[in-house]
Amino acid sequence: MPTTQQLIRKGRKTEEETSDAPALEGSPQRRGVCTRVYTTTPKKPNSALRKVARVRLTNGNEVTAYIPGEGHNLQEHSIVLVRGGRVKDLPGVKYHIVRGALDTAGVEERRQGRSKYGTKKPRE
Protein backbone atom coordinates (compact mmCIF):
# COMPACT_ATOMS: atom_id res chain seq x y z
CA MET A 1 0.00 0.00 0.00
CA PRO A 2 1.66 3.28 -1.05
CA THR A 3 1.80 6.27 1.24
CA THR A 4 0.05 9.53 0.32
CA GLN A 5 3.46 11.07 -0.42
CA GLN A 6 4.38 8.22 -2.78
CA LEU A 7 1.09 8.69 -4.65
CA ILE A 8 1.75 12.44 -4.98
CA ARG A 9 5.21 11.72 -6.40
CA LYS A 10 4.37 8.84 -8.75
CA GLY A 11 0.59 8.51 -9.07
CA ARG A 12 -1.31 5.39 -10.10
CA LYS A 13 -0.35 3.58 -13.28
CA THR A 14 -3.25 2.58 -15.53
CA GLU A 15 -2.78 -0.80 -17.16
CA GLU A 16 -2.70 -0.40 -20.95
CA GLU A 17 -4.83 -2.75 -23.04
CA THR A 18 -2.87 -4.73 -25.62
CA SER A 19 -4.38 -5.31 -29.06
CA ASP A 20 -5.48 -8.80 -30.16
CA ALA A 21 -4.42 -7.93 -33.73
CA PRO A 22 -1.30 -5.73 -33.42
CA ALA A 23 -0.22 -6.08 -37.08
CA LEU A 24 -3.35 -4.21 -38.25
CA GLU A 25 -2.14 -1.14 -36.27
CA GLY A 26 -5.64 -0.09 -35.24
CA SER A 27 -7.25 -0.56 -38.66
CA PRO A 28 -10.38 -2.73 -39.01
CA GLN A 29 -8.87 -4.50 -42.06
CA ARG A 30 -5.71 -4.30 -44.10
CA ARG A 31 -4.75 -5.26 -47.64
CA GLY A 32 -1.90 -7.67 -48.26
CA VAL A 33 -0.20 -10.00 -50.73
CA CYS A 34 -0.05 -13.77 -50.19
CA THR A 35 3.56 -14.93 -49.99
CA ARG A 36 2.70 -18.59 -49.31
CA VAL A 37 -0.55 -20.61 -49.30
CA TYR A 38 -0.44 -23.94 -47.46
CA THR A 39 -2.25 -26.30 -45.07
CA THR A 40 -1.40 -26.98 -41.46
CA THR A 41 -2.66 -29.31 -38.73
CA PRO A 42 -4.48 -28.12 -35.59
CA LYS A 43 -3.59 -28.71 -31.94
CA LYS A 44 -4.76 -31.81 -30.09
CA PRO A 45 -7.44 -33.16 -29.85
CA ASN A 46 -8.53 -31.86 -33.29
CA SER A 47 -7.49 -33.30 -36.63
CA ALA A 48 -7.78 -31.63 -40.05
CA LEU A 49 -5.84 -29.85 -42.78
CA ARG A 50 -6.55 -26.17 -42.14
CA LYS A 51 -5.97 -23.79 -45.05
CA VAL A 52 -3.77 -20.80 -44.15
CA ALA A 53 -1.76 -18.16 -45.98
CA ARG A 54 1.30 -16.13 -45.11
CA VAL A 55 0.43 -12.52 -45.99
CA ARG A 56 2.65 -9.43 -46.30
CA LEU A 57 0.50 -6.44 -45.31
CA THR A 58 0.73 -2.92 -46.77
CA ASN A 59 2.36 -1.70 -43.55
CA GLY A 60 5.21 -4.19 -44.02
CA ASN A 61 4.12 -6.70 -41.39
CA GLU A 62 3.94 -10.38 -42.33
CA VAL A 63 1.18 -12.44 -40.70
CA THR A 64 -0.38 -15.90 -40.92
CA ALA A 65 -4.07 -15.66 -41.85
CA TYR A 66 -6.77 -18.34 -41.94
CA ILE A 67 -8.78 -18.94 -45.12
CA PRO A 68 -12.38 -19.67 -43.97
CA GLY A 69 -14.98 -21.72 -45.83
CA GLU A 70 -14.85 -24.74 -48.13
CA GLY A 71 -12.49 -24.39 -51.10
CA HIS A 72 -10.59 -21.26 -52.16
CA ASN A 73 -8.88 -19.72 -55.19
CA LEU A 74 -5.87 -18.18 -53.45
CA GLN A 75 -2.30 -18.65 -54.60
CA GLU A 76 0.98 -16.81 -54.24
CA HIS A 77 0.73 -13.08 -55.19
CA SER A 78 -3.05 -12.97 -54.63
CA ILE A 79 -4.20 -9.63 -53.17
CA VAL A 80 -6.31 -10.25 -50.04
CA LEU A 81 -8.11 -8.30 -47.31
CA VAL A 82 -7.13 -9.35 -43.78
CA ARG A 83 -9.23 -8.84 -40.64
CA GLY A 84 -8.53 -9.71 -37.01
CA GLY A 85 -9.83 -12.86 -35.35
CA ARG A 86 -7.84 -15.82 -34.13
CA VAL A 87 -8.28 -19.53 -34.82
CA LYS A 88 -8.32 -21.29 -31.46
CA ASP A 89 -6.75 -24.57 -32.56
CA LEU A 90 -4.00 -23.08 -34.79
CA PRO A 91 -1.17 -21.55 -32.74
CA GLY A 92 0.10 -18.26 -34.15
CA VAL A 93 -2.89 -17.66 -36.45
CA LYS A 94 -4.49 -14.39 -35.26
CA TYR A 95 -6.02 -13.14 -38.50
CA HIS A 96 -8.71 -14.12 -41.03
CA ILE A 97 -8.87 -13.47 -44.76
CA VAL A 98 -12.11 -11.76 -45.86
CA ARG A 99 -13.94 -13.90 -48.44
CA GLY A 100 -15.46 -12.13 -51.45
CA ALA A 101 -13.10 -9.13 -51.25
CA LEU A 102 -10.30 -8.26 -53.73
CA ASP A 103 -8.82 -11.46 -55.28
CA THR A 104 -10.59 -13.82 -52.84
CA ALA A 105 -13.71 -15.46 -54.31
CA GLY A 106 -16.76 -16.14 -52.16
CA VAL A 107 -17.69 -19.68 -51.12
CA GLU A 108 -19.62 -21.52 -53.85
CA GLU A 109 -22.99 -23.14 -53.05
CA ARG A 110 -23.20 -21.39 -49.67
CA ARG A 111 -26.82 -21.06 -48.49
CA GLN A 112 -26.64 -19.95 -44.84
CA GLY A 113 -24.37 -17.36 -43.22
CA ARG A 114 -23.55 -16.06 -46.71
CA SER A 115 -22.43 -12.59 -45.61
CA LYS A 116 -19.48 -14.05 -43.72
CA TYR A 117 -18.29 -15.93 -46.80
CA GLY A 118 -18.83 -13.33 -49.55
CA THR A 119 -21.57 -15.29 -51.33
CA LYS A 120 -24.29 -13.55 -53.37
CA LYS A 121 -27.97 -14.34 -52.79
CA PRO A 122 -28.96 -17.34 -54.93
CA ARG A 123 -31.54 -16.49 -57.61
CA GLU A 124 -34.29 -19.08 -58.08
Curated annotation (Swiss-Prot):
Keywords assigned by UniProt, alphabetized: Methylation, Ribonucleoprotein, Ribosomal protein, RNA-binding, rRNA-binding, tRNA-binding
Lipid biosynthesis in keyword set: no
Gene Ontology molecular function: any one: structural constituent of ribosome
Biased amino acid composition, Basic residues: 113-124
InterPro entries, per database record: NA-bd_OB-fold, Ribosomal_uS12, Ribosomal_uS12_bac
GO BP terms in the entry: translation
Any one Gene Ontology cellular component term annotated for this protein: small ribosomal subunit
3-methylthioaspartic acid found at: 89
Disulfide-bonded cysteines: none
Residues covered by region (Disordered): 1-42, 105-124
Membership in a protein family: Belongs to the universal ribosomal protein uS12 family.
Subunit comment: Part of the 30S ribosomal subunit. Contacts proteins S8 and S17. May interact with IF1 in the 30S initiation complex.
Function as written in the Swiss-Prot or TrEMBL entry: With S4 and S5 plays an important role in translational accuracy.
Name the UniProt record assigns to this protein: Small ribosomal subunit protein uS12
Organism: Salinibacter ruber (strain DSM 13855 / M31)
Highest classification ranks of the organism: Bacteria, Pseudomonadati, Rhodothermota, Rhodothermia, Rhodothermales
